[in-house]
Amino acid sequence: MQKLFIVFVLFCILRLDAEVDGRTATFCTQSICEESCKRQNKNGRCVIEAEGSLIYHLCKCY
């Protein structure tokens, strides 16, 4: 059971570091998202998107 948990955690870490359609899949924090988008002179917003059976909390700049 512990091995399965470790594999799951490693998978999540690697998956969260991967690029998804040009956006980084992370657990989005609104304040951090707004700050990173402010550098691009855009408004930032956390959105939830699904890809297959996986759900991503993404920061999108508009």
Curated annotation (Swiss-Prot):
Q: Where is this site: Basic residue of the functional dyad?
A: R45
Task: Give me the Gene Ontology terms describing cellular component.
Answer: extracellular region
Q: Which UniProt keywords apply?
A: Disulfide bond, Ion channel impairing toxin, Neurotoxin, Potassium channel impairing toxin, Secreted, Signal, Toxin
Residues flagged as site, Aromatic residue of the functional dyad:
Y62
Q: In which tissues is it expressed?
A: Expressed by the venom gland.
Q: Which cysteines are joined by disulfide bonds?
A: C28-C46, C33-C59, C37-C61
Q: What is its main location?
A: secreted
Q: Where does it live in the cell?
A: Secreted
Q: Which family does it belong to?
A: Belongs to the short scorpion toxin superfamily. Potassium channel inhibitor family. Alpha-KTx 22 subfamily.
* Domain-related comment: Has the structural arrangement of an alpha-helix connected to antiparallel beta-sheets by disulfide bonds (CS-alpha/beta).
Described by its record, this protein's role is as follows: May block potassium channels.
Q: What is this protein called?
A: Potassium channel toxin alpha-KTx 22.1
